[in-house]
C-alpha cells in the first residue's frame, strides 16, 4: 500500500461518541479516501496484527471516548507509528451530543488535513 494511503482503525463502542468514530471511518471509506481495518481482529488474530505493521500507510486510530480502547489495542500489537484521535476532542460529549453531519464532516476535514 502506498505511504499516502489512509488506513483507519475505529472503536465504535456503544455510545454516541463511538457512533461518531464509526460514521467518520465509513464515510472516509465510501469516498475512497481510506480503508478500514477491524479493531477486534487485532486482539484475536496475531498474524493479522503482524501483517498490519507494514504497508498500512498513514494509520489513523480513532477512539470514541477517553477510555481509548482502540489506542490500547493497537499499542499492544507493537504498532507505534499512528495518529490517535478521539471524538471527544472535537467538542463531542459522551451520552449527550447527537450525531450530526456537521460534526462528522469536521472530524473528516481534520483527518484530511493530517
Regions found by a protein language model. Give the residues of each.
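Iron-sulfur-associated redox domains of electron-transfer enzymes in respiratory
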Residues: 1-114
Amino acid at each position: 500500500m502506498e505511504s499516502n494511503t489512509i488506513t483507519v482503525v475505529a472503536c465504535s463502542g456503544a455510545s454516541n461518541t463511538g457512533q461518531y468514530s464509526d460514521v467518520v471511518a465509513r464515510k472516509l471509506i465510501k469516498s475512497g479516501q481510506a480503508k478500514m481495518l477491524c479493531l477486534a481482529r487485532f486482539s484475536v488474530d496475531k498474524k493479522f496484527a503482524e501483517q498490519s505493521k507494514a504497508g498500512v500507510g498513514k494509520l489513523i486510530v480513532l477512539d470514541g471516548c477517553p477510555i481509548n480502547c482502540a489506542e490500547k489495542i493497537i499499542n499492544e500489537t507493537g504498532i507505534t507509528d499512528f495518529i490517535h484521535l478521539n471524538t471527544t476532542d472535537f467538542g463531542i460529549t459522551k451520552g449527550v451530543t447527537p450525531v450530526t453531519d456537521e460534526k462528522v464532516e469536521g472530524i473528516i476535514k481534520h483527518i484530511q488535513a493530517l
